[in-house]
From Swiss-Prot:
Species this protein is from: Shewanella sp. (strain W3-18-1)
Gene this chain is encoded by: rnhA
Membrane-spanning intervals of the chain: none
Ranges where the RNase H type-1 domain occurs: 3-144
Classification lineage: Bacteria, Pseudomonadati, Pseudomonadota, Gammaproteobacteria, Alteromonadales
Protein name: Ribonuclease H
Presence of the UniProt keyword Metal-binding in the record: yes
Length: 156
């Protein structure tokens, strides 16, 4: 059996105004090679961008991989590691019996994460972590670039 490739992924989301223009930034490292991705949306939220970044990164992988995914978003990390199990059992409802926010993205993240073996890591934002800082710049730049793309799942 072939060993899965080990990919290091760093992600961040940004939103100006929250809601407002937003963007995500991704840095991917594999065997000394680095790939960066970013994109912006006209109207979204910070949490949606924090979720979309790992989705886009994981969906870009062409085969099942071992992934170390690092983000400064406790919302994303806690959600995918802990909360999602209860939400799925309750039909995507919270413990307060309200619909889970950003359910479209949570479902996408759940689906794509099952294809890979993922170590979900958290890093404190704006604390000098090089890849996280780079993701922050990419995400903020995408949000500031007057994006016109529509975040179809955003519901104010």
């Amino acid at each position: 059996m072939t060993e899965r490739k080990l990919i290091h992924i760093f992600t961040d989301g940004s939103c100006l105004g929250n809601p407002g223009p937003g963007g995500y930034g991704i840095v991917m490292n594999y065997k000394g090679h680095t790939k960066e991705m970013s994109d912006g949306f006209a109207l979204t939220t910070n949490n949606r961008m924090e979720l979309l970044a790992p989705i886009i990164a994981l969906e870009s992988l062409k085969e099942p991989c071992r992934v170390v995914l690092t983000s400064d978003s406790q919302y994303m990390r806690q959600g995918i590691m802990t909360w999602i199990h209860g939400w799925k059992k309750k039909g995507w409802m919270t413990s307060n019996r309200t619909p889970v926010k950003n359910v479209d993205l949570w479902k996408r993240l759940d689906k794509v994460s099952q294809m890979h073996t993922i170590d979900w890591q958290w890093v404190k934002g704006h604390a000098g972590h090089a890849e996280n800082e780079r993701c922050d710049i990419l995400a903020r730049s995408a949000a500031e670039a007057n994006p016109t793309q529509i975040d179809e799942g955003y519901q104010p």
